[in-house]
Swiss-Prot record:
Homodimer. This is Dihydroorotase. Its EC number is 3.5.2.3. Its cofactor is Zn(2+). GO terms for biological process: 'de novo' pyrimidine nucleobase biosynthetic process; 'de novo' UMP biosynthetic process.
Amino acid sequence: MTHLTLTRPDDWHIHLRDGDSLADTVRDAGRYMGRAIVMPNLVPPVTTTEAAIAYYERIKAHSSTAFEPLMVLYLTDKTSPDEIRAAKASGKVVAAKLYPAGATTNSDSGVTDVNNIYGVLKAMEEEGLLLLVHGEVTDSAIDIFDRERIFIENILSKVVADFPGLKIVLEHITTKDAVDFVMSAGDNVAATITAHHLLYNRNHMLAGGIRPHFYCLPILKRNTHQQALLAAATSGSKKFFLGTDSAPHAKDKKEAACGCAGSYTAHAALELYAEAFEAEGALDKLEAFASFNGPDFYGLPRNADTVALVKSPWQVPESYPLGSTTVVPIRAGEIIGWKVED
């Protein structure tokens, strides 16, 4: 197969950052994505509806296409049910994000104990606002490769049981444990999967030298977990959909003694997913994963127009502009076999 026409996809998890980076991140995100769930972990975080709408306007100011950002509230111990109701009424905010405090980039203001937000989760269940979850515990005694599994066992399973009417997305899943949990849960639980977790495992990051641009959170796992993710993404299950978790950091912040977590894939998101699906002999499953399952779960219409993927190898630039700096993308300087036609 050398040509694919797909309903325009959406990205159900992306980091656009802010300030002078926005012009570059919005350009890449909006090149062929119809919509994107925009992460709220700015500095300061997007904790109010007012802040979310202001961020929406900053993003739209840099968009020359019909690209539509879907906004997310950042949950803290102090988030109120009234804020949830205001978010739902805004028409711009579609979800709220649970970051366990300290779990990832700019998450220090996150939730210290999920019991602190049970009133908020009840309001979300009543209002129909989705809960997005970074599923890792933060206990320093827990091995970093086990933090997703422990979070599911100790925290998420209880939330799912206590709020059966709450739609929950376990974001950027990385383990067989997460796949099994999502598959066994009700129709109100789904998951996003990144392209880099489908294409790579921890050997790519650590064997033969440390490759900092593969360092992300949740961290890449062993290849058995990678295979479980591939099986889930290509299974045809409606519970799994595209979320790049594309997370730009300036080159000097990645290539450092203590480098930041995050991989940049927005420059070639659909192309990278196509490679993963092609390797599994499942290109026929790509459209549902990229274009149908996400909007169906969110209760939004599917995009009406299409994009074309062609088998046309191209070389990824060594870097892309990121405001006054540069970002090194996944596959920098390497060949990608698929290309979205402009």
